């Protein structure tokens, strides 16, 4: 796929207010409400499309996620336009605290098992002069369990491991538009050929445009700085629709990536979106609340519609 250059947005930073000299208790009284007012629902769910969004599940929330990607649409009628082929991933994700989410999953592609954490570092303030971005740290580990190696050349458990570290930087510019930039580092303990880099750097960008309270359109693109040399790698591109219905978030996706784990769709995609190598897919999630009262749950539902 030919290189795709996306020029991204300059974030708008509001000038902070200057507090006058006052009594210490008066200052604390004025600042206290500001520290509690943060922007919510930058994205509808925990995924933009393929990649993670800035959003976490709140404390005590367990989410079951099913992700599915079919084969290429341009395979034609013989393969039912890709529907005869598929890759599926099941995952459980849990809000350990309001700021820390943990997850585990299993993909049919390469029989990969993955675990991840996502930690909120900074939140975007809702008041004028407050911090203009939301920032989270994401980390994952993947174990490739498929046995597709020649006898006597099987990799060790350590050689089957890959790791991803990402900084998720997002801003909700308005109720209808959000943007996220995602610098990424993917590390492989082993590579196919000597020229393949163990460490791959990439930069992703994702956006959300809200159409109604429950429907939005999303886009996502990841540019790889130093791609693998052993394959004809392409940059991951995806477009999709978010539909939210109560405890469900349903995403319909068109992407040139058949995989759904960061180390795979960022660095191992080989299809060209503009040549018709498009994979139809979907993500569907169901959230379950534990240990939360009805009042707090109602508040979260209202925030999700913002």
Task: Tell me the role of every PLM-derived stretch.
Residues 197-203, 233-237:
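Charged helix-capping and loop-helix junction motifs
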Residues 21-153, 161-165, 170-181, 185-189, ...:
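Transmembrane beta-barrel domains of Gram-negative outer membranes and organellar outer membranes
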Residues 86-88, 203, 208-218:
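Surface-exposed extracellular loop regions of Gram-negative outer-membrane beta-barrel proteins
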Residues 4-14:
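Sec-dependent N-terminal signal peptides
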Residues 158:
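Nucleotide-sugar donor-binding catalytic core of glycosyltransferases
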Residues 15-20:
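Sec/Tat signal peptide C-region and signal peptidase I cleavage site
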Residues 190-191, 195:
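Extended, charged alpha-helical interaction scaffolds
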């Amino acid at each position: 796929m030919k290189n795709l250059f996306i020029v991204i947005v300059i974030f708008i930073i509001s000038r902070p207010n200057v507090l006058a000299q006052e009594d210490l208790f008066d200052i604390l009284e004025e600042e206290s409400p500001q520290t509690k007012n943060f922007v919510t629902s930058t994205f509808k769910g925990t995924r933009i499309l393929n990649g993670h969004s800035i959003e976490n599940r709140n404390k005590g929330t367990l989410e079951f996620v099913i992700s599915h990607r079919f084969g290429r649409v341009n395979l034609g009628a013989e393969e039912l336009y890709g529907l005869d082929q598929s890759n599926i991933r099941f995952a459980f994700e849990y809000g350990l605290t309001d700021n820390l989410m943990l997850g585990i999953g299993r993909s049919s592609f390469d029989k990969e098992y993955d675990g991840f954490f996502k930690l909120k570092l900074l939140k975007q303030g809702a008041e004028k002069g407050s911090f203009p971005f939301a920032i989270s740290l994401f980390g994952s580990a993947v174990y490739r369990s498929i046995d597709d190696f020649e006898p006597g050349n099987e990799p060790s458990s350590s050689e089957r491991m890959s790791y991803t570290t990402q900084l998720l930087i997002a801003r909700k510019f308005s109720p209808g538009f959000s943007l996220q930039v995602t610098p990424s580092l993917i590390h492989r303990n082993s590579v196919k050929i000597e020229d393949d880099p163990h460490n791959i750097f990439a930069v992703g960008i994702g956006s959300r445009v809200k159409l109604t309270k429950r429907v939005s359109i999303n886009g996502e693109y990841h540019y790889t700085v130093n791609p693998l040399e052993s394959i004809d790698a392409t940059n991951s591109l995806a477009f999709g629709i978010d539909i939210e219905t109560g405890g469900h978030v349903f995403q319909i996706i068109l992407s040139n990536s058949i995989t759904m784990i960061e180390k795979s769709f960022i660095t191992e995609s080989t299809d060209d979106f503009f040549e018709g190598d498009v994979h139809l897919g979907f993500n569907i999630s169901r959230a379950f609340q534990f240990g939360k009262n009805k009042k707090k749950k109602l508040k979260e539902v209202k925030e999700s519609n913002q």
